[in-house]
Amino acid sequence: MALRVTADVWLARPWQCLHRTRALGTTAKVAPKTLKPFEAIPQYSRNKWLKMIQILREQGQENLHLEMHQAFQELGPIFRHSAGGAQIVSVMLPEDAEKLHQVESILPHRMPLEPWVAHRELRGLRRGVFLLNGADWRFNRLQLNPNMLSPKAIQSFVPFVDVVARDFVENLKKRMLENVHGSMSINIQSNMFNYTMEASHFVISGERLGLTGHDLKPESVTFTHALHSMFKSTTQLMFLPKSLTRWTSTRVWKEHFDSWDIISEYVTKCIKNVYRELAEGRQQSWSVISEMVAQSTLSMDAIHANSMELIAGSVDTTAISLVMTLFELARNPDVQQALRQESLAAEASIVANPQKAMSDLPLLRAALKETLRLYPVGSFVERIVHSDLVLQNYHVPAGTFVIIYLYSMGRNPAVFPRPERYMPQRWLERKRSFQHLAFGFGVRQCLGRRLAEVEMLLLLHHMLKTFQVETLRQEDMQMVFRFLLMPSSSPFLTFRPVS
């Protein structure tokens, strides 16, 4: 039985003027009988030239989530605007996400990430499932699903993640006990990045990087620096047309391409290691790459492309979610204690079978959903619709680009009563259809979803048994949009042994 939390929790107010946030109802009003035309959708207007200047000056759009949240407050649960000659419709209610899912084809289409595509085209490399659309996307995705999402795959990679999670906690415990105070205060974000990088890389390539405290390889440092640089430069380039940034941001483009080149070279080496083991007849350890090679359904180029994207997409997203969960647990000690009791009660079954963490920690799973409600790392889900549909009684024609803003959905009092409160138990009280979309939906949902869930559940389970997590900071973290939604600075957390 899930442990329930009844104590007061700290208010999470990661946006301005929460007490004036308007509840944008879902189905309270009877829709008018006459269908409204697309042109009647409220329009969000902004001066595109001033916006470009702002993006150039700020090297990104750090307040995008706040700007869109304010637009919903002013215009209602649906609005439209134009960008690059295309019409974009923005929504934020679960019912509209469900309607998008209902009309989704077997080939869901989304906009490619231009800086990543530019690198692939310049270097003559193939795209992976993150960047592909159409039949090529479907073929690649069907080959990868069994290695990432199936029960058999989860059973295969859980032991890999559990080893890394235990190593990480043991190393942190050792550092804590070496401190004369018997506790340790650290900037947790870099530590979470190292953990998720180590775990994801181990699952995908079958090799350890040494980021959790031992056997650190020089090439691992170069590789992780390249990942950081790639994400930073992506943010600086993604909001402006390449025709402009090729002149205004030549240094950033060079950094972006150089970073991807390092990542590409590193992944090539990992794939060659797998082929070498096969050629030498050595015992093959399980990994996502070795499974792709063994299946022989994807070309070497396709394996390389998908491996690059899997590694790039599995690190920061999970690390940020772990950081924000630990921060909320630190300032909500009663929630933390309830989770600790759940972990201790489930410890025997998880020791016998680490995969039990997926089923025996319902409150911890709910806490992760609550974190992603307040801090959706991927702050929106987007689709180019393949057929006409009706959203909020407006006609939306096929070919329209529709964006679901998760940041605003998670803060809508009509969807989540008392949205400012960190309340994991809300996810255990009733089914919430299309309200947990942090990993997307449908056949194009996040390919690394199960890996991310396992990494978060196992690490938090081992940490809660071992450490009391505290913080002196009770005010909210300022969140910024840098390709991903992340804290503007890392929270400083204190770890003490559990008494």
UniProtKB/Swiss-Prot annotation:
Reactions listed under catalytic activity: a steroid + 2 reduced [adrenodoxin] + O2 + 2 H(+) = an 11beta-hydroxysteroid + 2 oxidized [adrenodoxin] + H2O; 21-hydroxyprogesterone + 2 reduced [adrenodoxin] + O2 + 2 H(+) = corticosterone + 2 oxidized [adrenodoxin] + H2O; 21-hydroxyprogesterone + 2 reduced [adrenodoxin] + O2 + 2 H(+) = 18-hydroxy-11-deoxycorticosterone + 2 oxidized [adrenodoxin] + H2O; 21-hydroxyprogesterone + 2 reduced [adrenodoxin] + O2 + 2 H(+) = 19-hydroxy-11-deoxycorticosterone + 2 oxidized [adrenodoxin] + H2O
Biological process annotations from GO: aldosterone biosynthetic process; cellular response to peptide hormone stimulus; cellular response to type II interferon; cholesterol metabolic process; cortisol biosynthetic process; cortisol metabolic process; dibenzo-p-dioxin metabolic process; glucocorticoid biosynthetic process
Gene Ontology cellular component annotations, sorted alphabetically: mitochondrial inner membrane
Tissues with expression: Adrenal zona fasciculata/reticularis.
Any one Pfam family match given in the protein's UniProt record, by short name: p450
Cofactor(s) the record lists: heme
Topology within the bilayer: Peripheral membrane protein
Effect of substituting R127C: In strain: Dahl salt-resistant
Major place of residence: mitochondrion
Compartments where found: Mitochondrion inner membrane
Protein name stated in the entry: Cytochrome P450 11B1, mitochondrial
Source organism of this protein record: Rattus norvegicus
